[in-house]
Amino acid sequence: MLTLDKIYHAAFVLKDVVRETTLIPSPKISANNNIYLKTENLQVTGSFKVRGAGYMISQLSEEEKARGVVACSAGNHAQGVALAAQKYGIKATICLPDGAPISKVEATKSYGAEVVMVKGVYDDAYKRALELRDEKGLTFVHPFDDDDVIAGQATIALEILNNMKNIDAVVVPVGGGGLISGIAYAIKHLAPHIKVYGVQALGAPSMYNSLKGGSIETLASVSTIADGIAVKRPGDNTFKMCSQYVDEVITVTEGEISSAILALIEQHKMIAEGAGAVAVAAAMFDKIPMKNKNIVCVVSGGNIDVTILSRVIERGLLTSGRTCNLCIELMDKPGQLQAVSAIFASLGANIISVHHERASEAMDINGCYLRIVLETRNYEHIDMITTALKDAGFRLV
């Protein structure tokens, strides 16, 4: 059973295992609220997950420690369990979905754990971990639906409350619900006036749908760059706790997540993974139902694969109006490309790439398409460019 005493005990046990992460202001994230970032992406292993895993493993009996532990994860919980097991001299077996980022797989191995790759998503890895538990007598370290794990995650709330006064809301990423359950439980018992909002990716809204429907819903599939919260089904305990203590769960799109990752890089020189950036995305795109309030966004992790990061940055630039794709119909005669380029130059747009296309059934026999990618300042700048092109007689396709 989760209690405040258990959470305070977790904070005591974890003081030599985890670091107390900083709480920093982020004045440019939102024009409507005062945003502060709880930087769990700078935690040991790059994620908050080591808190819950560390506390749960610390509470095992000597017999359980001797047999070893097994866990499943989209990546971050794996590293937390692996590091905690290493600290206590315990053998750890970790089941990972085969789509887990390479960076997380290699990091898990680096802490000495045995990694078992499982075809599918988190829920498939979960099933395999339970099979190994039964076959080998291992202790299963649940990534979210366990009171000790939730107590470990709740220590984040204690740090937030100790480091900042006059908080109006805390915004938390939601996958299976362990992180937000712990934070919401602690906050509603210690400072019940503070609102707690959860954020899920639109492509993996299991807790959002479950709370809206009033019962646990299992999704047929999930698809999101926020792999750390790509969970088909919330936990039984976490669903009950979220129903009781969380004020609202909201969703953000893939483009909004990408924009948030980009904003953190540019404004704070900080790397966040997709799951870690969803709370910031909610603040950036005014999804939080508050104005002129002090809001803490939990940046839950920073373990993003560099190949994914490059694609996310490209998408973030596109979503925020920093790049744009145009298709312009031209007459196939000399000087047309020069005329278009002159418009771009006069408005300060930089050409990234150009593709000249003559063969298309849709165009006039004497025409051609110019497909072009531009570096722009914002959406207003894009509007200026498209207006200038139309005024010059060019047709946008």
Q: What are these model-predicted stretches?
A:
Residues M1-V397:
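PLP-dependent amino-acid enzyme catalytic core
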